[in-house]
UniProtKB/Swiss-Prot annotation:
GO terms for cellular component: extracellular region; host cell postsynaptic membrane. GO terms for molecular function: acetylcholine receptor inhibitor activity; ion channel regulator activity; toxin activity. Expressed by the venom duct. This is Alpha-conotoxin-like Reg1b/Reg1c. It is found in: Secreted. It comes from Conus regius (Crown cone). Occurs in 2 forms, Reg1b has a 4-hydroxyproline at Pro-6, Reg1c contains unmodified proline at Pro-6. The modification 4-hydroxyproline is found at P6. Its main location: secreted. Disulfide bonds join C2-C8, C3-C12.
Amino acid sequence: GCCSDPRCKHQC
């Protein structure tokens, strides 16, 4: 998911 992706982790 996004929480594991550094490109969108800031959204978590």
